[in-house]
């Protein structure tokens, strides 16, 4: 038996007692397709990498809300593709829900920071990149990622992610990119549009256009399922407001301490 050190401690312990050239790190709520290991081997044979990761998607058996949340977390129109989409607005940082890394690199970097409650995987990926190691996105190395089953749970999850981004910015100021600020800008923008719309109702059209974009894109991705399309709009707003408010609150607390 080992003491419960959370996900980071467990992963670090597993890495220390492991053997082999590469480590595969996965979340407990992920399901692997049958071809996962074959895809990893094929991708590494084609392109060498010190660390790599792949996208996550929804399994056909997932319920409607899980599929909607999966859309919100992976769509280019909500995340800029930074979670592993083929289109992305930022350098690729492997995430712990689907990550591979050379064992010697993991040991040399001392693994995950066990003092961090949230954002420890981005912290680790940042140290990988700053250490001069290569990271690669392997689109074929995907996992089915089970999501929350309630929007309030999802809100709290992404709220913590927004807070973690500010904690990471304090450690690595140069890692904060425009794409990370977009949810906060979205929150302020939506509130501003709602207030200004009282005087100029046509401004609501801007918000409506974004809603329609999300609805059409999500409905198309889920083969014409209108219900999932509607839920995806709700999930997208939950994701953006959760991350955005967490980001703003953590930023405000940080600035007040200065």
Pin down the residues of each PLM region.
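Glycine-rich, basic loop-to-helix element that forms the pyrophosphate-binding segment
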Residues: 2-18, 39, 89, 93-97
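Short, flexible, basic/aromatic active-site loop/helix in glycosyltransferases
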Residues: 54-60, 69-92, 107, 171
């Amino acid at each position: 038996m080992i003491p419960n050190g959370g996900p980071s401690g467990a992963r670090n312990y597993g890495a220390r007692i492991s053997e082999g050239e590469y480590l595969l790190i996965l979340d407990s709520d992920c399901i692997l397709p049958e071809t996962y290991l074959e895809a990893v081997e094929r991708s590494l044979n084609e392109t060498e990498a010190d660390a790599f990761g792949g996208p996550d998607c929804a399994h056909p058996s997932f319920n409607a809300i899980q599929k909607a949340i999966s859309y919100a977390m992976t769509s280019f129109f909500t995340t800029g593709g930074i979670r592993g989409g083929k289109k992305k607005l930022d350098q690729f940082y492997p995430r712990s829900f689907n990550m591979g890394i050379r064992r010697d690199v993991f040991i040399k970097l001392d693994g995950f920071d066990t003092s961090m409650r949230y954002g420890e995987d981005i912290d680790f990926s940042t140290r990988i990149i700053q250490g001069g190691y290569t990271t690669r996105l392997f689109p074929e190395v995907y996992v089915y990622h089970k999501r929350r089953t309630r929007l309030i749970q999802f809100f709290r999850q992404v709220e913590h992610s927004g807070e973690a981004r500010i904690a990471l910015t304090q450690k690595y100021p140069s890692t904060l990119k425009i794409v990370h600020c977009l949810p906060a800008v979205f929150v302020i923008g939506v509130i501003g549009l709602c207030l200004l719309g009282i005087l100029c109702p046509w401004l609501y059209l801007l918000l409506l256009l974004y809603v329609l974009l999300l609805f059409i894109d999500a409905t198309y991705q889920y083969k014409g399922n209108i219900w999932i399309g509607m839920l995806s709009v709700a999930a997208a707003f939950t994701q953006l407001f959760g991350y955005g408010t967490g980001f703003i609150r953590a930023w405000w607390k940080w600035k007040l301490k200065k």
